């Protein structure tokens, strides 16, 4: 199996392992975190080995590259004589990243953009947040959360128009705008949208599992109930969940 893999086929597993690391951290399970970090490290070793077999680079080169990058980006640690406070450290960090982006743009014969370096493979919510933060650095931003809420209402109304028209592509477009605006609201509220959605997922899962267990205790199968009965069971589950918070 290993011999049949390439970078693209392994990439989904690498992403999955990174999420499992995050899951262990959120659960504050250090034993699990140790195991998941090992699994993630194996992914790094696997990719490095495949690259080595193509005479591209090896694991040592990966370690050397990140070491060099950390030294360049953290002069306040490795050259403390120049950086006396957090503000100058942050400025130096941003200047170094700007230099790296400019070098990459020149290498690729294109103009430098404030959005350079935001990976396209990031989860959509995370990428939206990063794009918005980059745009905000050059002043392209709302002053506070209030106009963002107005924008959400506007996008919701535009989505409704497309829904009423039965316009599939239009619904996709407007729903994307709405989600992007919701991420923007999260940013203005200083909330990580990925963390907020994970918490929402966990709450739904917790309440739905309680719904299933409660119905099972009554000898009922959710599949046999209509939506009215399921809504009533859901409300009971929410009440139970809120009482245990």
What are the roles of these predicted feature ranges?
Residues 1-36, 42-175, 179-245:
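Flexible "arm" and connector segments at domain edges
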């Amino acid at each position: 199996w290993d011999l049949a893999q390439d970078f693209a086929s392994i990439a989904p597993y690498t992403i999955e392992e990174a999420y499992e690391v995050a899951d262990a951290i959120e659960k504050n399970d250090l034993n699990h975190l140790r195991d998941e970090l090992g699994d993630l490290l194996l992914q790094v070793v696997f990719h490095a080995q495949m690259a080595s077999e193509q005479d591209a680079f090896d694991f040592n080169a990966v370690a050397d590259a990140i070491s060099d990058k950390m030294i360049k980006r953290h002069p306040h640690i490795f050259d403390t004589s120049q950086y006396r406070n957090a503000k100058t450290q942050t400025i130096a960090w941003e200047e170094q990243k700007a230099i790296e982006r400019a070098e990459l743009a020149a290498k690729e014969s294109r103009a430098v953009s404030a959005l350079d370096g935001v990976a396209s493979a990031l989860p959509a919510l995370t990428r939206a947040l990063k794009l918005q933060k980059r745009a905000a650095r050059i002043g392209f931003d709302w002053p506070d959360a209030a106009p963002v809420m107005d924008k959400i209402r506007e996008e919701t109304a535009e989505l409704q128009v497309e829904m009423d028209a039965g316009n599939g592509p239009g619904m996709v477009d407007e729903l994307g705008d709405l989600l992007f605006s919701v991420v923007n609201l999260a940013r203005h509220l200083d909330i990580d949208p990925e963390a907020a959605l994970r918490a929402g997922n966990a709450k739904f899962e917790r309440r739905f599992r309680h719904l299933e267990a409660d119905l099972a205790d009554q000898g009922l199968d959710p599949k046999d109930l209509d939506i009215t009965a399921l809504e009533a069971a859901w409300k009971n589950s929410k009440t139970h969940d809120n009482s245990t918070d």
